[in-house]
Design a protein with these regions (language model features):
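Short beta-strand-centered interaction patches in the first periplasmic/extracellular domains
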Residues: 2-6, 96-98, 107-110, 114-116, ...
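Short secondary-structure junction motifs
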Residues: 45, 89, 147, 181, ...
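C-terminal amphipathic alpha-helical segment
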Residues: 214-226
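PEST-like low-complexity, intrinsically disordered acidic/proline/serine-rich tracts
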Residues: 124-126
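Polar, S/T/G-rich
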Residues: 81, 85, 131-144, 165-178, ...
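N-terminal export/assembly leaders
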Residues: 47, 120-122, 138-163
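Assembly/oligomerization scaffold segments
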Residues: 1-117
């Protein structure tokens, strides 16, 4: 295990080199990316937010916003690293495009989600037939979404008559996964469902006062099993 007071990097942690690609093409270097926020978690759809400095008060226009680069629905990829040794942090689609005007300046804010977001947009009803495994039903549902890859671990529960009734595909999938003691992950347009790993070697060790920047921890007795 490396020193817990530092986090190993492939290059010296000096110059950060972020890259944003839309439909596979890097955005112009003239666009000033002010902030990147990546949010990934279990049983949640991966999200990203870009804040770009945009707006010319003298010309009274927003060049980046007025263009067609960040039109909702376009594929986007965010990469970052040190000294151009970059790796992918997020892949997904643009879902929201907004501008903000403040006394301190103006911004273009782009919100993105993993392609699994399409699973949350409508409710469906479906009969899957007799004696079908939950993993097979989930694979069938996920296979109806273009651009989304499914990696579903085998599940032991078999239903005699499995029905999805007036539920979004995302709620149906997370519900069946929970019933089988599994977690749902969305990462780079891949839907992964597997059991949590509770053994093995730690990937990284974080230390309070050194590598831990923010932490929220709590215990809530209301949800503890007696």
């Amino acid at each position: 295990m490396a020193d817990s007071r530092t986090i190993e990097t492939t290059r010296p942690g000096t110059v950060v080199t972020p890259i944003v690609k839309v439909e596979g093409t890097e955005i112009p270097r003239t666009m000033q990316v002010e902030a990147m926020v990546i949010d990934k978690g279990v049983n949640r759809i991966a999200a990203a937010k870009l804040v770009i400095i945009d707006g010319d008060t003298s010309a009274q226009k927003f060049d980046a916003s007025n263009g067609d680069l960040f039109v909702p629905g376009k594929n986007i990829e965010i990469l970052c690293g040190y000294e151009s040794d970059n790796y992918t942090l997020f892949k997904g689609v643009v879902i929201k495009h907004s501008i903000k005007l403040r006394n301190s300046g103006s911004q273009l804010v782009i919100e993105c989600r993993d392609k699994a977001i399409a699973m949350t947009l409508a409710r469906h009803s479906k009969y899957f037939g007799e004696n079908i495994k939950d993993s097979d039903a989930i694979t069938t549902v996920a296979g109806t979404y273009s651009g989304l890859t499914a990696d579903v671990a085998d599940m032991n529960i078999t239903s005699s008559d499995l029905v999805q009734y007036e539920a979004t595909d995302w709620d149906f999938i997370t519900g069946r996964a929970e019933l089988n003691g599994m977690l749902v992950y969305t990462d780079d347009n891949t839907l992964s469902i597997k059991k949590p790993e509770i053994s093995g070697t730690a990937v990284v060790e974080l230390s309070f006062g050194a590598t831990m920047l923010e932490l929220d921890a709590e215990i809530d007795s209301r949800i503890q099993f007696p």
